[in-house]
C-alpha cells in the first residue's frame, strides 16, 4: 500500500481537527446543558419543597380554623341553650304571674269607683250618728247595732209601691 498523498493527509488532519473541535464544543455545550438542567432541577426541587411546605401550612391553618369554628359553634350552641332555658324560665314565670297581673288590672280598673265610694263613706262618717228615734228607741252607739235602714227613693211614706223598693245593703268583702 502506498502512502496517501500529503494533501489528503492535511485534509484528513484538518477534518480530524474539525471533528475534535466539534466534539469538544459539543462536550462543553453538554456540560453547560447538564449544569443548567441540574440548576433548574435543583430550583424546581426547592420550589416544590416550598410549595409543599406552603401547602402543609395551609392545611394546618385550615385545620386550626375548622377547630376554632367548631369551638365557636359549640360555644354558640351552649349560649343558645342557656338563653332558651332562660326564656323558658321567664315564660313559666309569666304564666305564674299572669293571674296576679290580671287581678292587679282589675284592681286598678275598679280603683276610681272604689276611691269615690271610700270618699262617700268618709263623708257619711263625718255626718255622725243619727239621733235616737222615738218610735224605735234603738241603740245608736258606735259599737252597738243601729236601727234598720231602708232606701228612700223619693216616695212618700205610705205609698203602696213597697214592692218596687229594694233594701239597701252595706258591707265589705275582703
Swiss-Prot record:
Chain residue ranges for the region called Disordered: 128-174
Keywords on record: Coiled coil, Cytoplasm
Coiled-coil ranges (or none): 7-97
Location (main, coarse): cytoplasm
Subcellular location: Cytoplasm
Any one Gene Ontology cellular component term annotated for this protein: cytoplasm
Protein name in UniProt: Vimentin-type intermediate filament-associated coiled-coil protein
Species of origin: Mus musculus
Amino acid at each position: 500500500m502506498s502512502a496517501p498523498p500529503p494533501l489528503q493527509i492535511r485534509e484528513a488532519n484538518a477534518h480530524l481537527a474539525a471533528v475534535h473541535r466539534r466534539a469538544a464544543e459539543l462536550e462543553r455545550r453538554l456540560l453547560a446543558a447538564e449544569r443548567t438542567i441540574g440548576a433548574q432541577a435543583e430550583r424546581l426541587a426547592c420550589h416544590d419543597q416550598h410549595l409543599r411546605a406552603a401547602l402543609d401550612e395551609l392545611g394546618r391553618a385550615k385545620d386550626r380554623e375548622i377547630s376554632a369554628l367548631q369551638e365557636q359553634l359549640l360555644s354558640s350552641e351552649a349560649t343558645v341553650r342557656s338563653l332558651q332555658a332562660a326564656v323558658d324560665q321567664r315564660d313559666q314565670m309569666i304564666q305564674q304571674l299572669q293571674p296576679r297581673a290580671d287581678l292587679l288590672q282589675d284592681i286598678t280598673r275598679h280603683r276610681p269607683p272604689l276611691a269615690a265610694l271610700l270618699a262617700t263613706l268618709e263623708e257619711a262618717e263625718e255626718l255622725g250618728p243619727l239621733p235616737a228615734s222615738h218610735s224605735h228607741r234603738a241603740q245608736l252607739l258606735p259599737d252597738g247595732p243601729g236601727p234598720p235602714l231602708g232606701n228612700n227613693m223619693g216616695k212618700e211614706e205610705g205609698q203602696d209601691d213597697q214592692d218596687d223598693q229594694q233594701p239597701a245593703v252595706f258591707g265589705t268583702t275582703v
